[in-house]
Design a protein with these regions (language model features):
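Transmembrane alpha-helices and adjacent helix-loop boundaries
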Residues: 2-333
Length: 333
């Protein structure tokens, strides 16, 4: 019986993951070559796709695994973007070299912001993150060193020709999206992932079993903030200009939340599927103006009512698949 179960269960599952791995490598190879056979407009769109995916994945980690519902997710976007622009312009250093520093600056901000934020919970925490994001927007709006209301251009990219600039930003976005997915998978398969899942299921039970709830949430907060900050920095390399109103816009949070809800909160596959659906809808119906936003809102409501687990849950109802090997099932006797 055990050998039959092994043949019918474990081996096919491993074979399936191997096939998924080969397909993913082929897709990544094709995407890496995109600058040589796609237009600048297509590359700019793909930069948006990869960076917004990373932001949505980070929000999904916070809400789906840490129970941290963030309404002010744009604060990480703004900190990462402004850190990159300020450091690159003021120091005159290649912005690609400064991306790790911008990520580190966002991680430091996340660590410091946890002090007041983690004193709040529930709705107060969600609103508190939005208030903090608004405070940052107002501070940059009145800071002449950061360009005040007019923002600042990314002057350090001016020395590169258009092809090199676009290709460099595109590859940075691709690495950001793939790297975010890799880090999320690595985290969820490790001890931190186990701790977060136990906290998500029951904080009382997790605490009783010896899990440090605050430490687990803090680690997740810093990791998700860093991913979002890096994505924000790369996203604004694509536009070559930052302004307080755009960078700290609530639209970033709205997009991340919509993608996570549509695809499936608490999964790695959900943000991937949600991002694809979001951009298909945007590119197809954005020209309809306010009706487009009404449609997005209605779709989100319908999804939450009829498919609370998102579009990915509709897939798993029909097929038992786990392409990233994150799902943890209870052992069967």
């Amino acid at each position: 019986m055990n050998s039959i179960a092994l043949m019918n269960g474990t081996r096919p599952r491993k074979a399936g993951r191997a096939v998924v791995g080969v397909v993913l490598l082929a897709v990544l190879g094709a995407l890496a070559l995109a600058p040589w056979f796609t237009s600048f407009a297509t590359q700019r769109l793909l930069v948006e796709v990869f960076t917004v995916f990373a932001m949505a994945l980070a929000w999904n980690l916070l809400a789906g695994y840490g129970g941290l519902v963030v309404v002010g997710h744009q604060m990480f976007v703004g900190v990462g973007a402004y850190a990159l622009f300020a450091l690159s312009n003021r120091l005159g250093i290649n912005p690609w070299i400064m991306l790790p520093l911008a990520t580190a600056a966002t991680a430091l901000f996340a660590l410091l912001s946890a002090l007041p934020m983690f004193r709040l919970s529930g709705a107060h925490f969600a609103v508190g993150t939005w208030v903090l994001a608004e405070m940052l927007r107002i501070l940059t709006l009145n800071n002449e060193w950061l360009g005040a209301g007019g923002g600042m251009p990314l002057e350090a990219l001016g020395s590169f020709d258009r092809w090199t600039r676009n290709a460099g930003v595109y590859w940075s976005a691709l690495i950001t999206g793939v790297g975010a997915l890799f880090i999320a998978r690595l985290m969820l398969r490790g001890k931190l992932g186990l701790a977060l899942m136990s906290v998500r299921d029951s904080e009382a039970a997790a605490a009783a079993s010896g899990v440090s709830i605050q430490r687990a949430k803090l680690a997740l907060w810093v990791i998700a903030g860093s991913i979002t900050g890096l994505a924000g920095a790369v996203a604004y390399m694509n536009t070559l200009q930052v302004t307080p109103d755009a960078t700290f816009s609530l639209n970033w949070s709205a997009a991340a939340i919509f993608i996570a809800v549509l695809g499936g909160i608490g999964t790695l596959e959900g943000p991937i599927l949600g991002t694809i659906l979001y951009f298909l809808l945007r590119e197809s119906f954005a020209s309809y103006g306010s009706w487009y936003f009404i449609g997005l809102g209605s779709l989100a409501i319908v999804t939450m009512v009829f498919a609370p687990g998102g579009a990915w849950s509709l897939v798993t109802r029909r097929w038992v698949i786990d392409p990233f090997g994150v799902r943890r099932d209870m052992p069967r006797r």
